[in-house]
């Protein structure tokens, strides 16, 4: 350095909050660019065709029955490939269901499984305190499976991160679709939930999308509780159940994707729930975390019960997610859970699969991805796992209605 050169000023340290704001902005912009390339804002999410075997499984009939209907000119006309393979759209599958319900009904089976007189709206809260448990993946595939099997379903995204909404074609950073907060808020701007519900690309499945605005409920509720001139805050735990009562007749099942923390949103969802599904990754740290979650949850719900807001459930279950059966420690942890909780653990597990994670890259579920886009064995193994889990949950829902399980 030249002796006459001016001294170089030391670099100013960057404040942590400035650094994370800069990096958060960078991530958002890059992800937004990728999202725009894969799913432009004016794009509409479409749904693939379903193969004959898939349609037969979702309808609960044999493939030969569907072939016979086609040959007799009954029901919607399937799309036929150059190789002669038949496939149906989800809308056509719904038409087939209606046709079978009218012309193929037996005492053993109703092809349209809508609620009957005296059967209660089923509200399934999907919860976990720890991220990475497959909570949103579970909620999305369950809601879609129930719609594909003929139920009228409302999915409610209560997680401000809005992953469930993204999987259904909503882009919270662009769409600004109203969230459930609009039906929960304590001021005179509260709206009916019917104004917030949006259709999805799955016939029979609607959604209440999420956005960061939901976080406002966590701040508003303590203020409302301290307001001596109103009782609204003191009965905050009734707000979701009251909102859902406005659309009670429109749906058979509501699937709520709860946020991954024990805040007012989660508590309000649990007091509205008729059943709870706790997702758990079978690793020691995850199970330990879940144990703490259960202790905290029980401690919070007890005083709420004492003021008349008991959580009255038809059922609750633990679902093992992202399971690798060949992993010895995971298999041991599954055995540990089954020994401890017996019938409270679902018999079927959601297997870890690259098929599910690969679909997530393009903001799709496995029910949206075409088999030809993946290794066939990987796809089928993941699909069999998902269908087995979801079918078991549907049986629990139907049992809550007092229906006999039809194999």
UniProtKB/Swiss-Prot annotation:
| Chain segments annotated as transmembrane | none
- State a single Gene Ontology molecular function: DNA binding
| Annotated InterPro entries | AAA_dom, DNA-bd_dom_put_sf, DNA_Partitioning_ATPase, MerR-type_HTH_dom, P-loop_NTPase, Plasmid_partition_RepA
Q: Which UniProt keywords apply?
A: DNA replication, Plasmid
For the biological process aspect of GO, one term held by this record is: regulation of DNA-templated transcription
Pfam families attached to this UniProt entry: AAA_31, MerR_1
Q: Which domain of life is it from?
A: Bacteria
**Alphabetized CDD domains for the sequence:** ParAB_family
Can the keyword Cytoplasm be found in this entry's annotation? no
PANTHER family this protein is in?
Answer: P-LOOP CONTAINING NUCLEOSIDE TRIPHOSPHATE HYDROLASE, PARA FAMILY PROTEIN CT_582
Which family does the record claim for this protein? Answer: Belongs to the ParA family.
Protein name, entry field:
Putative replication protein A
Instruction: State the species of origin.
Output: Sinorhizobium fredii (strain NBRC 101917 / NGR234)
